[in-house]
Amino acid sequence: MRKFNKPLLALLIGSTLCSAAQAAAPGKPTIAWGNTKFAIVEVDQAATAYNNLVKVKNAADVSVSWNLWNGDAGTTAKILLNGKEAWSGPSTGSSGTANFKVNKGGRYQMQVALCNADGCTASDATEIVVADTDGSHLAPLKEPLLEKNKPYKQNSGKVVGSYFVEWGVYGRNFTVDKIPAQNLTHLLYGFIPICGGNGINDSLKEIEGSFQALQRSCQGREDFKVSIHDPFAALQKAQKGVTAWDDPYKGNFGQLMALKQAHPDLKILPSIGGWTLSDPFFFMGDKVKRDRFVGSVKEFLQTWKFFDGVDIDWEFPGGKGANPNLGSPQDGETYVLLMKELRAMLDQLSAETGRKYELTSAISAGKDKIDKVAYNVAQNSMDHIFLMSYDFYGPFDLKNLGHQTALNAPAWKPDTAYTTVNGVNALLAQGVKPGKVVVGTAMYGRGWTGVNGYQNNIPFTGTATGPVKGTWKNGIVDYRQIAGQFMSGEWQYTYDATAEAPYVFKPSTGDLITFDDARSVQAKGKYVLDKQLGGLFSWEIDADNGDILNSMNASLGNSAGVQ
């Protein structure tokens, strides 16, 4: 055996250790505790004014710090997202910080890597969330169908739509996760308001606190720009799937983003207007105001990327809406111009994003109101016309009673003006393409009490003393409650086969409720197919137990699906 003297051995060992140190990669860094959720569109969870609520950026600002407890720091630090370099800079010692931007939403596995000429050493991965309003950072919201909802495939090529209301998350406790989304092609979010104070949004004053809420939302925002009426319900209220204190988007919008991940083919549209929010439309004969509105809708869609277009619910061009002081013969022309300009804006947005955006509108089914607008011209800008073939009669009139959502006129009043068929015929007579017309169904009833003086056992031929006790508001009863409570006992169910309309009547009190049920919806669906119309939609999804939506799907020819 060869022998080394002690000084030489020490020299060799020292030389070897020095070479190993020079050839080693850096030590392993540790990501420090810190924020792991970032957002491209930032939401202030305490704000009430829209201008303060939302901050839109092109990319999320991400920050990460790290420590090195052992080993060499190397010369370069890198941030890896899902294994790809997102940032690099000098490695300066036992700790470091990187600030960088991420322009695409999602969930990323983030690592810090320290590098030198001999290699890189990466930290353990930490998940970060980069939130964007397309919902790409969220797990799909796919919940079991509730109540009587059965699964259907959307394979008929027809529209199956329904409205979901912002305020439904309160007393109704109807949240987005309860929507039977697989049974819909279109979900309309009611309602998006248009900013404006006294003289512009006076109809809102009939609902306690609603006008004041809009003024808070629109603080510092120009009149005739869109906003969010209730930021808490829309973005700040914890809901299933968006419950953490640091979730960037909560509320209805947060859940709708997740719903879109589960049902990417579902078209989700913000509906602007509605009965008490239509006043600003009457001022849009002024092009400056109209341009400001259209521009703000574009900004809204750019901000809230889960939306697929816009629905305009102007009630009603020409007047006879909530505000009796509003309405002009020029409204029809304004409506056509508004549709044309919205379409041009949406086409421009499509060119920028590569997405297709729909333009729809909810309109009255009364011929008197239809004739105020050249829908044969407006249709060229529109994807669908949602014909509100409901609210024909109700306790707003105690002397003239009738079916609120009938397909045809009843035998006892064959000259009834307000029917679904008459509304459709008025549009077709103008030259509107049948496929553009989507017929409305009611997931609620309207009713009276004290009905008396009627003839031939037909309560509609009498008069009433007031509105029937309602589910949430007197005069209006959810279909769910009608089906569950008013189909037996003293209540008498009758189906008017001529009108294709059901009603229930309680002779002892004179309570009378007119509504849609599975049979009347089946008749509407058959009519849609016979006339080659666009489909069916409903107001409003929280009031149904599944019977109405099931019938909408079945009557249009959608086949049974699986959950």
Curated annotation (Swiss-Prot):
Disulfide bonds: none annotated. Its EC number is 3.2.1.14. The keyword Repeat does not apply. The active site is at residue 315. It catalyses: Random endo-hydrolysis of N-acetyl-beta-D-glucosaminide (1->4)-beta-linkages in chitin and chitodextrins. GO terms for biological process: chitin catabolic process; polysaccharide catabolic process. GO terms for molecular function: chitin binding; endochitinase activity. SMART domains: Glyco_18, PKD. It comes from the Bacteria. Keywords: Carbohydrate metabolism, Chitin degradation, Glycosidase, Hydrolase, Polysaccharide degradation, Signal. Residues 1-23 form the signal peptide. Residues 158-559 form the GH18 domain. Belongs to the glycosyl hydrolase 18 family. Chitinase class II subfamily. This is Chitinase A. It comes from Serratia marcescens.
